[in-house]
Amino acid sequence: MFSRLAARLPKASALNGVAARQVRNLSQPAITGSKGRNMPAREPRTTAAATGAEATFTIRDGPVFQGTAFGANTNISGEAVFTTSLVGYPESMTDPSYRGQILVFTQPLIGNYGVPSNERDEFNLLKYFESPHIQCAGIVVSDVATQYSHWTAVQSLGEWCASEGIPAISGVDTRAIVTYLREQGSSLARISIGDEYDADEDEGFIDPGQINLVKRVSTKAPFVVTNPNAKFHVALIDCGVKENILRSLVSRGASVTVFPYNYPIHKVAENFDGVFISNGPGDPTHCQETVYNLAKLMETSPIPIMGICLGHQLLALAVGAKTIKLKYGNRAHNIPALDLTTGQCHITSQNHGYAVDISTLPSDFKEYFVNLNDGSNEGMMHKTRPIFSTQFHPEAKGGPMDSSYLFDKYMENVELFKSNSQVYRDNRPTQFMIDILSKERVGVEPTPLSNAA
């Protein structure tokens, strides 16, 4: 495995080719922190607690598990996936990338440190959650802690699930569930409280893979997350952005304008110093508007671009590559990813069910990171332009911060781009010099700029 990967290690090369353009400030109302998120309204959810009731976890065309309910007294269906993360369940459950999925925790005991408050930081971003609400459809655990202890905790996991309308089941064999999902792949499943549905009733299973989930988690209108000492202005395409991605940008000196996933970003790129594409849920091929807009952006602007997770996949589609669905995905806080430019290995946080088919990547891009567990692609970079993306999450939350330096790399690209733009603006030739140089070069009267194509 390592010998094969070593052969793929290219020499590191600096990003260059940054062209110049004039930077202007976009006229947008500055909304305090992520309170500006205008997420689509959800259907009313049942909030009655179902603690202690009988519950059933049914995998379509697979085994049925009997357990005990906690959380909301409601039935749901979705795609069953598992995470091997030991901690960080509040962050995982509020990660929009889990939208439409039933999350199975392999860690035997969940909930022992409770659920924290919705406190916000100095940028008015949520400190302990990655979005304002639970995003997964339901959770499955081996054992749930009914008593909790932590200085930030304000309620139990069961109380939180009930208040958010999320059903949950405990007392089931999560090892058997994960073994099935690893062998058969991620499967449709449902959680039922009380009497179980007919196991053969297809109407009881909803496939979130057939739905544009990004549309359900993306903001409906642009908003701005401000930094009072901002030196840069970044446009972020919201496909289901995590709070810590916003924090990672704002804390590095940027004000961030967040746009809906299908916003024609290429039409406003000249107002920004960089473009960022966020994480998000579901099949990237559902976001054709985003793919088109990104392709137009790269055709018309040399602006620095960075993508994470779904943003990485959308960027790959925009340059002509293809994506594939993984058998059971990668969802953990301890997955090794090899940097092919340096040979260094990073332990990364991951949450995805799709990956970029590296064999379809165009010649002007190269593979950046590779997964040391399964050999799947974990990143790509342009050979000459300041464009790169990662499949894993350098912002973590939860997970290790090994790769957080990638945000520094992106901001260096942004700073260089802005400074080059300033040099261009300060040194543009005057109309007089354009006329003189044109006459000397071709010996004819130059075409007036106002009439030039």
From Swiss-Prot:
Keyword Membrane attached: no
GO annotation terms (biological process): 'de novo' pyrimidine nucleobase biosynthetic process; glutamine metabolic process; L-arginine biosynthetic process; pyrimidine nucleotide biosynthetic process
Could you list this entry's UniProt keywords, alphabetically sorted: Amino-acid biosynthesis, Arginine biosynthesis, ATP-binding, Ligase, Mitochondrion, Nucleotide-binding, Transit peptide
Mostly located where?
mitochondrion
The subcellular location is: Mitochondrion matrix
For whether the record's keyword set contains Transmembrane, the answer is no
**Where along the sequence do coiled-coil regions lie?**
none
**What Enzyme Commission number does this protein have?**
6.3.5.5
Q: What does this protein do?
A: Small subunit of the arginine-specific carbamoyl phosphate synthase (CPSase). CPSase catalyzes the formation of carbamoyl phosphate from the ammonia moiety of glutamine, carbonate, and phosphate donated by ATP, the first step of the arginine biosynthetic pathway. The small subunit (glutamine amidotransferase) binds and cleaves glutamine to supply the large subunit with the substrate ammonia.
This chain belongs to the protein called Carbamoyl phosphate synthase arginine-specific small chain
